[in-house]
Every structure is written in C-alpha cells, then in structure tokens.
C-alpha cells in the first residue's frame, strides 16, 4: 500500500468523483457529510456507489455522515474502498457501537471538538483505528478560537504525541487558504515539522505543496540516505545540502522498520 501524505476531500457528486481518476493526491476522502446538503444525501450516495463499482481506485476513504452511517455503510458494503473516516469522534463508545460496521475497513478517527480533544488518549489507543485526523475548523468554531498555526500549536502537538505513542498515523487539518497557495504550502511544511504523517486538503491545487513538504519523509529517500550513511566511515553525511548524523539515521531506521512491518501485514 502506498504511503499516504496527501489526502484530498472530494464531494460525492458525479462530476467531482471523476476528478479522482486524474488527481495526484496519495488518497481521496469521498465526502458524504459536511460538503453535502441534506437534500443531496441520497443522490450523492448513489453517485458514490456507481463510481466505486465502475472504477478501481487505491486509497479511497469515505467520510460518513454519523446520522446516516448504518444506511450508508450497508449500501457501500460490496464496494471496494480502503476505509472510512468517522467525523466528530468524541469517545470510544461510538467506535465500539459501530465496530461491526467497520469490519475489514481501515478507520480514520476525525477529532474536531473540545470533547474529542479532551479524550484524545483513549481515542488514540483504540485498537480499531489506523489514524487520527484533526479538524480545526469545527474545533475553533466550537471554542470561538481564532484558527491560526500559532494558537493551535499545543493542540496539534498533543494529537501527534498521543497518535505516535499508540502507533497511529496522524493527519493535520486542511488549509482553507485556497487563494493563497504560498501560505497553504507554508502550513504544510509546518505540519511536517510538527511530526504529522500527512495533511488533508480541500482543493487539488494544494496537493503539490503537501507532497513537497512531506517529500523528505518518503521511504525511498530515507532508504537512500541510510544506505549512503552506512557506506561511508564518517559520522556526518551531507545530502542535498542537509546534514545527517547518527540520531537522524536511528530515526530513519525506525521509520523503515515500521514501513516494512506494515507492508508485511
């Protein structure tokens, strides 16, 4: 399975779904929730099922509507897709309740409320999820907090810490600066620096910036650096102007071990 750094939200409308076929994102999140009005829910579910039945797409996730979850997953049961994104996760009780519906699907828990953040350790430790994702827009709306990288730093660091502690991937909130690509790219770089495994996006033009920001963490690049370091007799390696020492190589080896373990499952 390909490494996922960039995840593009795609509303489940027919014309939007077709764009998945030419997208450069590592994964796609077909949205049946926030971007879809209540009147469109049934039509969009029909369109999503039709798309999945007629196209082979790797790394497609479905963001379900919690109120319609059982109906949606029942109808999607025979379709091929990698997993689901569960919105507004606030505790493990809901995940327990829906465990049967999640069977054989990768689950991304979207944490986007004050209650969810307050229970982040128990959510991160839940064995049935593969990843955590942060939804800043809902969180800041609920707390009347300004959405800025500086103000959200402690919350994001907490999410990353607990995700890593329990072996889960962690994906950062999407940037809404679709008219300021430079700023969005800077936010993606900040996400990578904080230790996130990737970042979500709401527009295709932000995907290149996300891919570039996380390029330093691509497996092949890491493997190349480790091999070069071990083939020399120096304590320091310089690649493309960047200095790597023993502690960097130890970290890269951990990443490679994790990647190999996941690939063999």
Regions inferred by a protein language model and the residue ranges of each:
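Expand to "…catalyze enediolate/carbanion chemistry for C-C bond making/breaking, isomerization
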Residues: 1-265
